[in-house]
Amino acid sequence: MAKLTTRPDPNPKVPKLKAPPGACDSHIHLFGPVSKYPFAADSPYHAHEASPEMFIALQNTLGLSTGVIVSPGGYGRDYTMLADVLAQYPKRFRGIALVRPDIPDSELARLTRLGVRGMRMMSHKRGQHVPNYDPAIAARVHEHGWHIQFYPHGTDIVEYADKLLALPNPIVLDHFASIPSTGGTEQPAVKAVLKMLDTGQVWLKLSGPMRCTSEPPPYPSLTPLARLFAKHAPERMVWGSDWPHVNLEGMVMPNDGDLLDLMLEWVPDEAARNRILVQNPNALYGF
């Protein structure tokens, strides 16, 4: 039976960080209502409703302007909700879809018009209910200008680096490339990501710190890693909250105001921080 994940903190703090105009949250998920958007039969989790209106209210508190909806694994390859929200809010949102390998080109074109800019794939270690590495569909979505958003597992970006770079698409690595923060900045997975960033083909999301450590907020072991990546290639970074933070059972639920304020610690330079929050997502997602 699928587990019901915990809710996000209902009382987000007003952050100390004053976000620049046009600031983007580059990684969120939306859910429900379940009567209209049911979870996939093989989804390992169910989530409470997290509507676009709820997220817009959060953005107003945080001072953010736009967002990138990543179609969640809980919906499998059904992107109906994503498409509906993009049609409803064409200026505020862009999307990342999970699609089937036999999706018609006409449907890819429709999704592109709606604002989908990439396809999410994951390490095979994350299961088969979501798309894994697939060069054939990557080549097809590249024809529509899409990038590949890839979520590694643990340190296996080392195994996937060359495969990803062989694709024609730009590559966006989720959640610090899933690298365990306890391994420090000299571990092979970190060096692999730095080399990938140097190619100019790869972007990295400063998002989901709770996916890289079992520590409670503010995730201090991740700070050296975040600073290293942001200093090495600020022009290749985007930031995301990962709201509504599903699958954190047994962990401390972060406050979204505090999550945004981590950028003050991770990227002390204001010009670089503003680039990560505004110019980079504008270029990557076409706002």
Q: Where are the language model's segments positioned?
A:
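Mid-to-C-terminal alpha-helical segments outside catalytic/metal-binding sites
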Residues: 2-22, 48-66, 228, 234-236, ...
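Short, electropositive alpha-helical surface patch
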Residues: 77-93, 225-233, 255-264
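Active-site gating/metal-coordination segments in enzymes
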Residues: 2-11, 76-156, 162, 203-209
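Active-site environment of divalent metal-dependent phosphoester hydrolases
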Residues: 31-34, 74-77, 102-105, 129, ...
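Catalytic pocket-lining loop regions of alpha/beta-barrel enzymes
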Residues: 3-4, 131-239
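Divalent metal-dependent hydrolysis catalytic cores, especially in the metallo-beta-lactamase
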Residues: 40-75, 92-98, 116-124, 146-148
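Hydrophobic faces of well-ordered beta-strands that scaffold small-molecule active sites
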Residues: 24-28, 67-70, 94-97, 119-121, ...
